[in-house]
Amino acid sequence: MASSMMASTAAVARVGPAQTNMVAPFNGLRSSVAFPATRKANNDLSTLPSNGGRVSCMQVWPPEGLKKFETLSYLPPLSVEDLAKEVDYLLRNDWVPCIEFSKEGFVYRENHASPGYYDGRYWTMWKLPMFGCTDASQVIAEVEEAKKAYPEYFVRIIGFDNKRQVQCISFIAYKPT
């Protein structure tokens, strides 16, 4: 047994000559003189991209007082006709309309500092999802009913794709005054 261990260690200890011609040694970086100059000699700024006069008409969203809610929240409140067009779009894509409502229209945390179930991301569903709905007036009628029942709550319409199991669209249909 000892002789077999000696033979195996002797075979491992044998080292061949090092091959130095495999990789060329590092000689440092090349001189920058060999590279062509790509800089302009003058400081001509006329070729730089610019949004020019459009800067004066841009506005910044004020961080206080105007909260952004969902899709289309930067627009004025949607009229009944505008809501009907959005719901028609939702129905044309074969999405299931759902109506939800909440006292707070944005994500908030009052129970814990980390995100969880009760942080305002989940709204209460108004009745059941409207499977089989084919007319926008049915959805608008349900929104009006939710507004009458809860006038101080936000009401939103979501479009749910039951084939992919995802929410595809969501927008505020009613904001309390």
UniProtKB/Swiss-Prot annotation:
GO MF term list: ribulose-bisphosphate carboxylase activity
Cellular localization per UniProt: Plastid, Chloroplast
Gene3D superfamilies, A to Z: Ribulose bisphosphate carboxylase, small subunit
Chief place of localization: plastid
GO-annotated biological processes: photorespiration; reductive pentose-phosphate cycle
Lineage of origin: Eukaryota, Viridiplantae, Streptophyta, Embryophyta, Tracheophyta
Transit peptide residues according to the UniProt entry: 1-56
Its biological purpose: RuBisCO catalyzes two reactions: the carboxylation of D-ribulose 1,5-bisphosphate, the primary event in carbon dioxide fixation, as well as the oxidative fragmentation of the pentose substrate. Both reactions occur simultaneously and in competition at the same active site. Although the small subunit is not catalytic it is essential for maximal activity.
Expression induction: Accumulates to medium levels when grown under continuous white light.
Highest taxon of source: Eukaryota
Note from the entry: This protein is coded by one member of a small multigene family. The basic functional RuBisCO is composed of a large chain homodimer in a 'head-to-tail' conformation. In form I RuBisCO this homodimer is arranged in a barrel-like tetramer with the small subunits forming a tetrameric 'cap' on each end of the 'barrel'.
Record's subunit section: Heterohexadecamer of 8 large and 8 small subunits.
Alphabetic keyword roster: Calvin cycle, Carbon dioxide fixation, Chloroplast, Photorespiration, Photosynthesis, Plastid, Transit peptide
Descriptive protein name: Ribulose bisphosphate carboxylase small subunit, chloroplastic 6
